[in-house]
């Protein structure tokens, strides 16, 4: 086999359909858009969720809830992630950002108990779940709310 004999495998390359190039092509004149109407126009088509004038679903369903403007979002750190630190390390928010475990502090850091911890660490965070606090202390570490 030589370079000039190479050909793409059968059916792997499809020629694109050029519309509006004469009636003989099968896609001339109206270019597959039919005659007149909203969908035949440039930029034509109904908006997302439009149901032909019928009251749309999102307006038929009652409103629910509200957005709490004082909501605090915490950066979440699970216990299994803390195993990468050496025994006796003081884990602070600054250290977590520095090591790339979290990107930013948000409204603070919350330690959750997913996974298990084998290291003795002093963990400083804004919040701890009860199970996480228990697990850290069971491993011989300390928790400190900042």
Swiss-Prot record:
What organism does the UniProt record list as the source? Listeria innocua serovar 6a (strain ATCC BAA-680 / CLIP 11262)
Keyword Nucleotide-binding carried by entry: no
> Gly residues bias located where?
21-31
A GO MF label: structural constituent of ribosome
The protein's name in its UniProt record: Large ribosomal subunit protein uL15
Cellular component per GO? cytosolic large ribosomal subunit
**Per the UniProt entry, what are the Gene Ontology biological process annotations, in alphabetical order?**
translation
| Family, per entry | Belongs to the universal ribosomal protein uL15 family.
Q: Where is this region: Disordered?
A: 1-50
Q: What does this protein do?
A: Binds to the 23S rRNA.
Keywords from the UniProt entry: Ribonucleoprotein, Ribosomal protein, RNA-binding, rRNA-binding
Q: Please indicate if the UniProt record lists Ribonucleoprotein as a keyword.
A: yes
SUPFAM superfamilies, per this entry?
Ribosomal proteins L15p and L18e
Gene name for this UniProt entry:
rplO
- Complexes and interactors: Part of the 50S ribosomal subunit.
Known HAMAP family for this protein?
Ribosomal_uL15
Classification via Pfam families: Ribosomal_L27A
Basic and acidic residues: compositionally biased ranges: 1-18
